[in-house]
Amino acid sequence: MSGLERAMLDVVCLCAEWCSACRAWRPDWNVAVARHPEHRWQWLDIEDEPDLMDEVGLDIETFPTVLIARGGQALFLSAIPPQPAFLDHLLARLGAKDAAPQSVAPEAVALAQRLAARHRA
């Protein structure tokens, strides 16, 4: 793994088009994407990916939910408040070279690995 890959985070918003909170959060998400080009960003509508969600055993009930990973290793998976400052803080904490690994659910690990494999394909 190169130094660039270690520094880059994969940041995935697990959302649904029908969710008004997700739609309201999207403009702030887009601002975060523009502000942090060093990371790889994905807006993943879970309704468009039912097979993937079933495969990893993940049932998202609260939106927006964010997965943050590095090189296929899940670092964080949780619903977050739709506030840009909260996301910035999370990225700063998890993006630090000396960041302590978080305990994450096996479903988060599986999802991070599947999404990383997609990027390599």
Indicate where each model-derived feature is located.
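Residue-level signal for well-ordered alpha-helical positions
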Residues: W25, E55-V56, L90
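N-terminal leader/targeting and pre-domain segments
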Residues: M1-L9, D88-A121
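Local sequence-structure signature of Cys/Sec-based thiol-disulfide redox active-site neighborhoods
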Residues: M1-R35
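Short loop/turn motifs at secondary-structure junctions
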Residues: M8, D59-T62
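Non-catalytic, surface beta->alpha helical segment in thiol-disulfide oxidoreductase systems
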Residues: T62-S103
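Thiol-based oxidoreductase modules, predominantly thioredoxin-like and allied folds used
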Residues: L14, P37-M53, P81
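Short amphipathic alpha-helix with an adjacent loop that forms part of the alpha/beta core around
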Residues: S2, M53-L58
